[in-house]
């Protein structure tokens, strides 16, 4: 899967808006993930006790993790598909330590698309959504290949 330069520009244009409020976007994305797919919460020992959206919004740990997730994803997106160096340690930790299934990466991708559309409707129309979907699919495909190299079938 290859994105055109124009598609990468659409992705990076909306990502600049994410970077203007990484903590807020990260928090919204994780809350959306956990509400839409409660089973994903079980992978996070430090968040398992958060049962309501209000508890999630009040959690500084959740907000910090959102920043970590989006900072890593931003570094990958900015490489425009040439993300081997950034992807390798991420795949290693997610496959061997955290045991995060690829399906959960699909779930967070859905949450990212939803939050970006709801927060930036003017900058995240059909073309930008399509480009971001392709970029996230490329990320998932490449991380799945790394998982396989590591012997994790996630």
Swiss-Prot record:
Q: Under what name is this protein listed? A: Myoglobin
Residues that hold nitrite according to the record: 65
Protein EC: 1.7.-.-, 1.11.1.-
Q: Name one GO molecular function term.
A: oxygen carrier activity
SUPFAM superfamilies from the UniProt entry: Globin-like
List of residues that carry Phosphoserine = 4
PROSITE patterns found in the cross-reference section: GLOBIN (PS01033)
Question: What is known about what this protein does?
Answer: Monomeric heme protein which primary function is to store oxygen and facilitate its diffusion within muscle tissues. Reversibly binds oxygen through a pentacoordinated heme iron and enables its timely and efficient release as needed during periods of heightened demand. Depending on the oxidative conditions of tissues and cells, and in addition to its ability to bind oxygen, it also has a nitrite reductase activity whereby it regulates the production of bioactive nitric oxide.
Modified residues annotated as Phosphothreonine in this record: 68
Query: Which keywords does UniProt give here?
Result: Cytoplasm, Heme, Iron, Metal-binding, Muscle protein, Oxidoreductase, Oxygen transport, Phosphoprotein, Transport
Q: Where's it found, cell-wise? A: Cytoplasm, Sarcoplasm
Plastid: is it a keyword of this entry? no
């Amino acid at each position: 899967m290859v994105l055109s330069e124009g598609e990468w520009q659409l992705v990076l244009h909306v990502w600049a808006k994410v970077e203007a409020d990484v903590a807020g976007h990260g928090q919204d994305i994780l809350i959306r993930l956990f509400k839409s797919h409660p089973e994903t919460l079980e992978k996070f020992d430090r968040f398992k006790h958060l049962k309501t959206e209000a508890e999630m919004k009040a959690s500084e740990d959740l907000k910090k993790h959102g920043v970590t997730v989006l900072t890593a994803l931003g570094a990958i997106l900015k490489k425009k598909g040439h993300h081997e160096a950034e992807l390798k340690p991420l795949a290693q930790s997610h496959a061997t330590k955290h045991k995060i299934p690829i399906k959960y990466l699909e779930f967070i991708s859905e949450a990212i698309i939803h939050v970006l559309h709801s927060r930036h409707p003017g900058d995240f129309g059909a073309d930008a959504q399509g480009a971001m979907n392709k970029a996230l699919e490329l990320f998932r495909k490449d991380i799945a290949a790394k998982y396989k190299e590591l012997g994790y079938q996630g």
